Amino acid sequence: MALKQISSNKCFGGLQKVFEHDSVELNCKMKFAVYLPPKAETGKCPALYWLSGLTCTEQNFISKSGYHQSASEHGLVVIAPDTSPRGCNIKGEDESWDFGTGAGFYVDATEDPWKTNYRMYSYVTEELPQLINANFPVDPQRMSIFGHSMGGHGALICALKNPGKYKSVSAFAPICNPVLCPWGKKAFSGYLGTDQSKWKAYDATHLVKSYPGSQLDILIDQGKDDQFLLDGQLLPDNFIAACTEKKIPVVFRLQEGYDHSYYFIATFITDHIRHHAKYLNA
């Protein structure tokens, strides 16, 4: 599958690149960002996938989070896809910021008119890793995933739905229980229809209750002054309770004074890279 390089910038001895390709799952052209640390010049490196939140593209994380120095030091290839299909000309996809374009919610849609293109779950867990493994110096056996908000939800469900696939998972201010929050209800009813059992298959709090897999060490940072936490969009307490019940280790850090922004992410990104490096470089 042909990759078209859009940009390449040297950063902390490595290269931050952006590529475009024709996605089979999403039936459209997609961009993704990939950081190749200096270590990638001489051998295969672990792959760490970042999933962004609502309204984002592949650009937000690479320009705002300040992750490069840490990824360079730990020798991690970091991949950041877009958050939805683009340019599909589906009626209604650009009407609101929390549904459609920029809001794929990392599910495989089952409803018309979304089901042909809105297959971000399969894109992130299958198509993109295959593309990365085939075209970049990564070790396919060593991959982890993390994300923010909608992307934190995405990271948690990808790890919980695929035991053993990811070595570790972490999240910043994830949407932990989407079946119960306004964002989740809107997205899931649109993409997945009215059958709520289908919703639960993409809800981290429900998935953790039946998680059969290998031990997962989960790290979550949450800003205490996050407006969306206060608005009941994120519901981390429900997820923590489910993890505690299942004896799944989760480190949940409520960070005093921090909000939902990339300033919050930038503050704690090094901790998250270190968390993943511990497992990826073991």
Swiss-Prot record:
GO terms for molecular function: carboxylic ester hydrolase activity; hydrolase activity, acting on ester bonds; identical protein binding; methylumbelliferyl-acetate deacetylase activity; S-formylglutathione hydrolase activity. Changing residue 149 to T: 1.3% of wild-type activity. Belongs to the esterase D family. It comes from Homo sapiens (Human). The modification N6-acetyllysine is found at residue 200. Keywords: Acetylation, Cytoplasm, Cytoplasmic vesicle, Hydrolase, Serine esterase. Homodimer. The modification N6-succinyllysine is found at residue 4. Serine hydrolase involved in the detoxification of formaldehyde. One of its GO terms (biological process) is formaldehyde catabolic process. The keyword Secreted does not apply. It catalyses: S-formylglutathione + H2O = formate + glutathione + H(+); 4-methylumbelliferyl acetate + H2O = 4-methylumbelliferone + acetate + H(+). It is an enzyme of class 3 (hydrolase). Pfam families: Esterase. This is S-formylglutathione hydrolase. The modification N-acetylalanine is found at residue 2.
